[in-house]
């Protein structure tokens, strides 16, 4: 079965980014967990993905325990019609508002399923979360 692989660059600030590979079967919640792992953050706050790149505006997908949906754990990357160079925003911790810019760098076809997101590359030191 043919599957798509997405390679995304997750930028926190200039010089601090992570490159992550996920399959079209992974959800936005899987991407959330991979970002936190890549930046060594604890998973103890709400989050949202804003598909137009603007916080608190437009099409958004929310953490599963948020009051409103649609929920990130129900949205597969393969259903988002992502394109190369497309950018969207990940906002973590609605109090501190950690803001990450995500850019789709590659979309590859594979018949080898990727079971877990893979952190391909890191650049720059991750800041302290607290």
Describe these PLM feature segments.
Residues 1-130:
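Short linear regulatory motifs enriched in tryptophan with gly/pro/ser
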């Amino acid at each position: 079965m043919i599957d798509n692989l997405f390679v995304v660059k997750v930028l926190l600030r200039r010089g601090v980014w992570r490159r992550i590979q996920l399959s079209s079967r992974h959800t936005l919640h899987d991407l959330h967990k991979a970002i936190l792992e890549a930046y060594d953050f604890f998973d103890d706050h709400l989050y949202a993905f804003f598909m137009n790149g603007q916080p608190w505006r437009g099409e958004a997908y929310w953490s599963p325990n948020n009051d409103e949906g649609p929920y990130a754990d129900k949205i597969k990357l393969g259903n988002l019609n992502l394109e190369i160079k497309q950018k969207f925003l990940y906002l973590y911790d609605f109090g501190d508002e950690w803001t990450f810019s995500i850019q789709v760098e590659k979309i590859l076809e594979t018949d080898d399923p990727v079971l877990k997101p893979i952190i391909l590359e890191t650049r720059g030191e991750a800041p302290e979360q607290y």
